[in-house]
C-alpha cells in the first residue's frame, strides 16, 4: 500500500467533513472495550491509513472484543487539550509529536536536538534502541504507555524566497518562521538568524508579504500549504527530526486483559513500521511534485552546521537542560555533539 501525494492533498475536503462528526472507522457489535484514538493529521495521512489497518486487524484477532475508533484532524481538540484528555482517560490512545510531548515529558524532545541525526538509518538505530528505550521510560513516569515503535513525522527542511541554504553563513540574519518552541528559537539564534513565531494559519501570508523570508517544515507541510507559491528554494537541511509517539492512557491500557494488550501492541508496532515506509515514499513523490512546480532543491553537508551549533553553545545549553545522563544516551546513539 502506497501513500501518494494525491491522497494526502485530497485530505483537505475530508478534513472539513471530519470536523462535523466523529469518524468511527471501526464498527462492532457491543465490543467489550471501545477505545478512542485521537490524532492531529488528516484521514488520508499515513498515520491514519496504517492505524485503520491496525484497528481492523486488532478487532478481527480479538474477535470483536477491542474496538478502536479513530478521530483524525484534531477532532477532539488541540494537541494540548487532547493530551489532557489522554491523561484523564477521556481518550485512550493519542499520537503526539515528541517535541510537543516534551511540555509534559522533557526528555521527549531529545530526538529533536538540532542536527542530531544525519539520516533515517541513524534515526531508527537510536529510536529503536537505547534512546527510544530511555524516552519511553520517562513517558511511563507520566502515567502513559508508549508503544515500542515510534511513528515517523519527518525531517524538517528549510525553504527560502531568495537563495538556497548551503552553509551556516546563509542563515545569518534570515527572518525565518518557527513554531513557538524554545528548542527551535535557540537553534536558529545560534545560527544568527532572526526566528519569528507565526501561527501556521498565517504562515503563507507572512511569507507572501515578506514579514518573514523563510520557514522550516517537513515536505508534507510545504505541499499542503502550497508554500512553493511563495518560496523558491528548498534546502534539505534535515536539521530536526520528529516522530509521533503512539501513547495510551495507562489505566485504560492495563484494563485490557494481557492477551488483548499483546495483540494491540503487535499490530500497532507493525503499523508503525509500515507507516515509516509510507513516509519515505510520500517524501520522494512530494519532492518530485514540488520540483515540477518550480521549487529548486539542494542538499548540503551538515558538519559545518553542527560545528556552528557547538561553538555557539547550543549543544551545551541543551545538555544542561536535559541532564548529563540523557545527553550521554543521545550521544551514544548519534555520536558526539558537544
Regions inferred by a protein language model and the residue ranges of each:
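N-terminal secretory/targeting leader peptides
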Residues: 2-122, 130-131, 137-338
